[in-house]
């Protein structure tokens, strides 16, 4: 029997409500789908019938997921919820149900099977190269840049970096 870890897009598509397979979410995803929980008792029923389990990934899997996200260049596009779903999938050896391209890219880099929900999913794994449109700074490693999840700034001039896929 395949275990699946769900991100919030699976709930928007109704996946957990139409499947009898056991599924897992993290507490961060559980909190993210709060507006769905308010409208439906279905999420609570899934938990009570053990078709949905809330589980937290171990720190070493979170760290591995963050490292993989930084290596692929996707880290700035991932939320804590995203990182937690990747980490839990890695820890459990579970399939990851998501439509998020950045989540899919990192998961596939970690050899996690990704199940898209309402899209065709990603075709190729990508490593992103960051560059500055202002001073033409170009480096796929963003460790020298000032990084936050909302903005990646050029270490030379402070402009917002853009990204493009690296040619393999």
Model-identified regions with their sequence ranges:
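Conserved SAM-binding loop
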Residues: 96-97
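Feature 3881 marks metal-assisted phosphotransfer/nuclease machinery
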Residues: 1-6, 10-83, 87-92, 102-168
């Amino acid at each position: 029997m395949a275990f699946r870890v769900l991100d919030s897009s699976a709930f928007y598509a109704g996946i957990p409500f139409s499947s009898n397979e056991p599924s897992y979410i993290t507490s961060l995803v559980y909190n993210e789908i709060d507006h769905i929980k308010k409208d439906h008792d279905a999420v609570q029923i899934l938990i009570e019938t053990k078709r949905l389990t809330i589980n937290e990934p171990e720190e070493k899997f979170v760290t591995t997921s963050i490292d993989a996200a930084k290596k692929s260049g996707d880290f700035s596009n991932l939320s804590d919820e995203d990182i937690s779903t990747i980490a839990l999938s890695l820890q459990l050896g579970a399939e990851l149900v998501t439509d998020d391209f950045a989540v899919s890219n990192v998961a596939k880099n970690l050899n996690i099977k990704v199940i898209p929900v309402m899209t065709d999913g990603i075709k190729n794994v990508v490593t992103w190269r960051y560059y500055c449109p202002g001073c033409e700074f170009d480096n796929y490693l963003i460790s020298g840049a000032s990084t936050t999840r909302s903005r990646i700034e050029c270490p030379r001039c402070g402009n917002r970096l853009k990204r493009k896929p690296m040619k393999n």
